[in-house]
Design a protein with these regions (language model features):
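Helix-to-loop junction immediately C-terminal to a conserved catalytic motif
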Residues: 54
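Conserved ABC transporter NBD signature motif
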Residues: 62-70
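ABC ATPase nucleotide-binding domains
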Residues: 35, 76-230
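The feature captures the beta-strand-to-loop junction immediately N-terminal to the Walker
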Residues: 39-41
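ABC ATPase nucleotide-binding domain helices that frame the ATP-binding cleft
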Residues: 47-50, 146
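Non-catalytic connector elements of ABC transporters
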Residues: 250-294
Length: 294
């Protein structure tokens, strides 16, 4: 079996703020071609880690290695990374072509090569023919696709995405997730993604890092995180969960795993809520003093 190549390694990395907040004892290996998502509530430290990888924040302690080489002393523009933020950061007075070409021109890439690379990249993100348009003529999803394309044109070793779809509506977010998966698969690039949206993390990721209060609660595949949560925080943060306290322990049961025993015949219950969720309906019913969701 071929050994996987480590693309990014965080070694006992820490970033502390003056007020004591931040992250510490961060250790993680990310392998080539993976999409790894940092998932957690606001303020848990996920964006802090991403910004230290990109060089937009200095580490307090520890090391960050890309392809085995330390990058902690390199400024952002010298790092083999490209970062896409929630805001698109496209220049409104430039055409899409000019926005895409800007970084390549700074690197003194010949115009003929720039034209060929932009043509190929626009085909990859399904936006051929948009070269002469301006950002204001594009939808939010299209602008984010161009922002991602601009980053990919620089051929980074790591693509860093800081909640890039959070400003988009639900349907466009889903389309963008599918588009990102396709692009990542076609290019084989390593992606570090940050989100507070559990559905987004589950849909996109090869592995998920669930964070809480500046630390890792669990690192695993979406299936491992969902089926075998390591802590109560992970269990409550991922999917729906019923918690049943039993003495000094807590039993966690997902609603879809509950089976009603019909052995005692029909039971009367009061329907408390009905939620239509596309192809299925969630009912909350009250039976005596027991609440059951199914």
């Amino acid at each position: 079996m071929e050994e996987r190549k480590v693309k990014l390694e965080l070694k006992d990395m820490a970033k502390k703020y003056d007020n004591g907040d931040g992250v510490e004892h961060i250790n993680l290996k990310v392998y080539e071609g993976e999409i790894v998502t940092f998932l957690g509530p606001s303020g848990c430290g996920k964006s802090t880690i991403l910004r230290t990888i990109g060089g937009f924040m200095d580490v307090t302690d520890g090391d960050i290695l890309v392809d085995g080489q330390s990058i902690v002393n390199l400024p952002p523009e010298k790092r083999p990374t490209a970062m896409v933020f929630q805001s698109y950061n496209l220049w409104p007075h430039m055409t899409i072509y000019e926005n895409l070409a800007f970084g390549l021109k700074l690197r003194k890439v010949p115009k003929k090569e720039i034209d060929a690379e932009i043509k190929k990249m626009l085909e990859l993100v399904s936006m051929s023919g948009f070269e002469k348009k301006y950002p204001g003529q594009l939808s939010g999803g299209q602008q984010q696709q161009i922002a991602i394309a601009r980053s990919l044109l620089l051929k980074p070793s790591l693509l860093l995405l800081d909640e890039p779809f959070s400003a988009l509506d639900a349907k466009i977010r889903q389309q963008m997730r599918e588009e990102l998966k396709k692009i990542q698969s076609d290019l084989g690039i390593t992606v570090i993604f940050v989100t507070h949206d559990q559905e987004e993390a589950m849909a996109l990721s090869h592995r998920i890092v669930v964070m809480n209060k500046g630390k890792f609660d669990q690192v695993g595949t979406p299936g491992e995180i969902y089926d075998s949560p390591a802590t109560l925080h992970v269990a409550s943060f991922i999917g729906e969960m019923n918690f049943i306290r039993n003495g000094g322990s807590t039993i966690a049961v997902r609603p879809e795993d509950i089976v009603v025993n019909k052995g005692h015949g029909p039971m009367e219950a009061v329907v408390r809520t009905i939620m239509m969720l596309g192809h299925y309906v969630v009912l909350t019913v009250q039976l005596s003093l027991i609440h059951i969701s199914e």
